[in-house]
Amino acid sequence: MTKLTVKALSEDIGTPVDRLLQQFSDAGINKKDGDSVSEGEKQSLLIHLKKEHGSADESASPTRLTLQRKTRSTLSVAGSGGKSKDVQVEVRKKRTYVKASTLEEEKKTEQMKVEAGDKAKRDAEEAAVRELEQKAKREAEEKAKREAEAEVKVKRDAEQTAKRTKTEKAKKEMTTKNDQAKTEADELKLRQETEATRKAEAEAAKLVEDARKLAEENEGRWKEEEQKKTAAEKTADYHVTTSTHAREAEDAADRKDEQQPRRRKKKAKAAPVERGGRNQRGGRNRKPQVNKPTSMQHGFDKSATVAKQDVAIGETIIVSELANKMSVKATEVIKVMMKMGAMATINQVIDQETAALVAEEMGHKVVLRKENELEEAVLSDRDNSATVEGRAPVVTIMGHVDHGKTSTLDYIRRAHVADAEAGGITQHIGAYHVETDNGMITFLDTPGHAAFTAMRARGAQATDIVVLVVAADDGVMPQTIEAIQHAKAAGVPLIVAVNKIDKEGANPDNVKNELAQYDIIPEEWGGENMFVHISAKQGTNIEGLLEAILLQSEVLELTAVKEGMASGVVVESRLDKGRGPVATVLVQSGTLHKGDIVLCGQEYGRVRAMRDENGKDIDSAGPSIPVEILGLSGVPASGDEATVVRDERKAREVANYRQGKFRDVKLARQQKAKLENMFANMEAGEVAECNVVLKADVQGSVEAIADSLRKLSTDEVKVNIVGSGVGGITETDATLAAASNAILLGFNVRADTSARRTIENENLDLRYYSIIYQLIDEVKQAMGGMLAPEFRQEIIGLAQVREVFKSPKIGAVAGCMVTEGTIKRNNPIRVLRDNIVIYEGELESLRRFKDDMPEVKNGYECGIGVKNYNDVRVGDQIEVFEIVEIQRTLD
């Protein structure tokens, strides 16, 4: 029997050898890798490990055992119609065995409970006795206190009697003084009343005089107005029509009415009480009284004008709602919009600017309403302290693909990040912070491929310093130029790291000359940019790069509020299958704590967990620290601002408002009914569409791939992304792809079981990718297959007409000599005269010595009959060609 060594034991239990040797040492057993291990030593190690983890022998053994038994049998039961049927009978038994030591412990527990009850009873009796003694003591103290109070009361009554006598004497003296003061006050009051009466009479006389003057003025004005009214009535035109004959007839009727004597008006009789029957009074055929028609003319003449009012307009508004606010019909609003060059429907959403122009055009005053008042109130309710402290710099590593960005950061972190990425290229932003001898630095590693322009731009917005990595043997490349542009647009200082100086053919001076063309001037040339020569593979001068970064950060004097509610930016986000939405947030100010309520763009939630870039759980994160947070309601967009708020309810309201605002603005931009887009929409039906459903692992990759695919669209083939998102491919995605006839693309994600079943049933095209180059190339190939094929004409034969014969059946027959290629019977032809095409058609007959031939080769004579053409002459050339289909590809 072979001996069991320490190394073999470590492999069996799945533990590193170093850790197993340490455990043996802790147990008091000294071993090496090749030493054998006996059964006793293994038992000793096991007992030591159990003690170390807090599990004793007794606690490890089970105290209760439950056995379950299941028995199945078939019972035949007589049914209707004399037939019997089998019934499955299942009997389940359950039996529990309890360890004897456990029963003894339970008995001890019961006995301890009884003893505890007796003890509590004795304690209660003793407490009652003590309470009686204390009660008697309190009664004695109260009795003594009452006697002392009685003595004090007698003494106080005597003092009050003496004081009362003294007060009555003083009161009599005060009464005499008050009587004298009252007499003087009465005299003063009488004088004041006399003066007030005199003033009132003077004011009344003045009012009477003013009223008389006003009455005289009104009487004169009223007489003048009456005279004007009389003159106006004489010259007024009361005719209701413009017709001359109608006016004359109306004047004659008026004169006739004026000549008739006026009758006295009779008093109106009370209305008769209605009776049952057909009529109120009289017979069955009594006609109802019909009132005389009255004139349709108004009693006054006033032009109707629309009331001008203030119109409050939000960021988006429906056409019908705008019409209601202006108190006009929606058709009037649509007419005004059509005059202004925009075509709209009654239920269409228009933006604030368009609505304001329409309202002003119709003469109303516009009030632009701010709909984000709640959002501003929530974001402004913060308790950040006014004190600021220094913070670590946020550094973004940029450069062309394969120039060594991740390798540089890899050497700094002493980790191999590049190996984890597919193809050795960075697919999404990585955020890390490292501790150096001179302080902490936070790094953002951005991809260098052209498809990740948007991600690189986001990195530049959230950074303080940009480190541009340029390979010394490759020089300035397209993505290097883009990185320079992003850094300049963000106003961020740039440090150039010239990498791969250890390779043959490295030319750092050439890199400086190329970068100088883009205003990146080294300090030794009198510029402002620091150049550091490094080798990420060998680790050459990496410390010099860190010193340059820290020196630049000292010049910038970076500060931030450390205490208070945190705010930051979402660097990356994804949907994790086990943890839900996960967002990488770079804290920019304040301190983010576990349990805080965070508002991220259109999403919100409470931070359930926080992890650093190494996957360790942390409880708080200060400025310039990147963390992964869990607990959001959905996947936020990369670049959204993350802010800690006080109230979760208000955060939900703000998130819902932002979602509705995003939806309304999106609808307002989709003006498909505009007049200028009408013909473009009609022509859009002729363009072939390549529908795509895209799913990726992180939000940044979704945006980058979608942007690259849209750029592949041409005038003939258009890439239409019908659906995109973060996370695995679900059954919903597969159903959407089947309904829209789309292909499914998964980038670093896989389809679940239900989705695979739907894909197989619908025979969908599903493709997985881990490198973006392959995805873009294959989609480009698929789009090339959708292009309309190109047809080319290739000449396969040429015949010279030597003689022309007449045939009663065919007509003109050309006797020809084949000079080039082969003449085939079923191919189209052209007739050329003086190298000019005069006819294009097909052959009717091809003969040689009266025999029909399928083809005639070069150097032979033949007779050719041209279908529907008889004007063949000697010297003409007959050209035979075929149409070849050429498959097109996207450039």
Curated annotation (Swiss-Prot):
Region of interest (G4), residue spans: 499-502
Region entry G2, spans: 424-428
Gene Ontology terms for molecular function: GTP binding; GTPase activity; guanosine tetraphosphate binding; translation initiation factor activity
Subcellular location: Cytoplasm
Domain annotation tr-type G: ranges: 390-559
Spans annotated as G3: 445-448
Feature: compositional bias, Basic and acidic residues: 102-237, 245-261
Entry-linked Gene3D superfamilies: P-loop containing nucleotide triphosphate hydrolases (3.40.50.300), Putative DNA-binding domain, N-terminal subdomain of bacterial translation initiation factor IF2 (3.30.56.50), Translation factors (2.40.30.10), Translation initiation factor IF- 2, domain 3 (3.40.50.10050)
GO cellular component terms, A-Z: cytosol
InterPro entries: DNA-bd_dom_put_sf, EF-G-like_DII, EFTu-like_2, IF2_assoc_dom_bac, IF2_II, IF2_N, P-loop_NTPase, Small_GTP-bd
Major localisation: cytoplasm
Record's keyword terms, sorted: Cytoplasm, GTP-binding, Initiation factor, Nucleotide-binding, Protein biosynthesis
Binding site for GTP: 399-406, 445-449, 499-502
Annotated segments matching region G5: 535-537
Region described as G1: 399-406
CDD domains: IF2_eIF5B, IF2_mtIF2_II, mtIF2_IVc
Ranges where the record places region Disordered: 50-303
Domain of life from the UniProt record: Bacteria
Function noted in UniProt: One of the essential components for the initiation of protein synthesis. Protects formylmethionyl-tRNA from spontaneous hydrolysis and promotes its binding to the 30S ribosomal subunits. Also involved in the hydrolysis of GTP during the formation of the 70S ribosomal complex.
Name of the molecule in the record: Translation initiation factor IF-2
Species, as recorded: Aliivibrio salmonicida (strain LFI1238)
Gene: infB
